[in-house]
């Protein structure tokens, strides 16, 4: 049991903890063009995401995320990563993000759709991808993609 706790501590990096304690885009966008939400009924994690667009590009993102630190951190990171994408590219982002999280290797460079991503956001994606070594926690980092899949026009 002690080894499991020690191993899990590998996820508690300063960068991930910062996203968890001070999530980016942690606002409700009342004038959002599209929004979505998702809940993990097993653990109680929740996320709601609002997106404003300008000329079909994501111009603002608002998130409300509650639950474990991984859910909050991944929501924060993804909310930064999707800024500037077109709405039609969301599904491709979801697919590539899930592959990065679920496979044994790979990093943010594998998310081709994010080729012009800022270094700090890329580093955050690489940090959150370490969850792949803890299969039971992968769902925590994928809940944000479920909310994105559930987006609807307002």
Task: Pin down the residues of each PLM region.
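A generic structural signal for alpha-helix starts
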Residues: 69, 85-88
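Alpha-helical support elements that line or immediately flank enzyme active sites
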Residues: 74-86
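C-terminal binding/interaction regions
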Residues: 1-25, 87-154
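Structured beta-strand/loop patches that form or line metal/cofactor-binding pockets in enzymes
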Residues: 26-65
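Active-site phosphate/pyrophosphate-handling residues
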Residues: 47, 73-76, 139
């Amino acid at each position: 049991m002690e080894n499991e706790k020690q191993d899990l501590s590998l996820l508690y990096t300063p960068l991930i903890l910062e996203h968890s304690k001070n999530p980016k885009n942690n606002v409700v966008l009342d004038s959002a063009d599209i929004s979505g939400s998702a809940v993990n009924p097993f653990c109680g994690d929740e996320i709601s995401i609002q997106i404003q667009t300008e000329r079909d590009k994501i111009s603002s993102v608002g998130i409300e995320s509650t639950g474990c630190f991984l859910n909050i951190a991944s929501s924060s990171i993804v909310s930064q990563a999707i800024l500037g994408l077109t709405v039609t590219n969301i599904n491709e982002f979801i697919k590539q993000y899930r592959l990065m999280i679920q496979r044994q290797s790979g990093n943010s460079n594998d998310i081709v759709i994010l080729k012009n991503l800022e270094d700090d956001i890329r580093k955050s994606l690489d940090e959150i991808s370490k969850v792949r070594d803890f299969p039971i926690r992968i769902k925590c980092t994928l809940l944000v993609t479920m909310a994105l899949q559930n987006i609807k026009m307002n």
